């Protein structure tokens, strides 16, 4: 097995805090250093800067977990791939808490650009994931976008949306 450590809410950290955190993690026996855009507020440029900072201190595998509050999860995942991040999280239809994650099907399209290999995946999405998405209401919306802009945790949005006053 492999052990990964995930730095959560990385956009909220200064570069000094990121450096200090990586230095602490280096003292462990972790195999992979992950970072998460927990609020879905990163853009490609900041993603690239964070990756370069981590890689300047960490020689083992790296990973990224993106959220799609502002519709940038795919863009940030591609940026991570272009900057040699080894592990890229994605989920079918972006399934995940709140606004969701990088969509597997979009990532495959961007990486392969071979639509004929996606028929089975698209059937899976249509028949199974879209009904689940409708039932459990994941995916981005203006509330999650606003939350991403203002560093508001997705839990607050979920609680607000489930409250009959809103």
Residue map of PLM features:
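Catalytic cores and adjacent flexible loops of soluble metabolic enzymes
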Residues: 1-166
């Amino acid at each position: 097995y492999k052990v990964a450590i995930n730095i959560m809410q990385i956009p909220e950290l200064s570069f000094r805090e990121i450096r200090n955190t990586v230095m602490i993690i280096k003292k462990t026996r972790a195999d992979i250093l992950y970072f998460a855009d927990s609020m879905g507020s990163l853009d490609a440029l900041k993603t690239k800067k964070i990756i370069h900072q981590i890689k300047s201190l960490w020689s083992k595998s790296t990973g990224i977990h993106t959220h799609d509050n502002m519709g940038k999860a795919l863009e940030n995942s591609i940026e991570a791939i272009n900057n040699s991040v080894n592990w890229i999280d994605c989920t079918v239809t972006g399934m995940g808490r709140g606004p969701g994650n990088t969509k597997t099907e979009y990532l495959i399209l961007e990486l392969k650009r071979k639509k004929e290999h996606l028929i089975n995946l698209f059937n899976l999405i249509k028949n199974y994931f879209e009904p689940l998405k409708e039932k459990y209401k994941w995916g981005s919306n203006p509330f999650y976008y606003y939350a991403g802009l203002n560093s508001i945790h997705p839990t607050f949005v979920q609680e607000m949306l489930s409250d009959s006053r809103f």
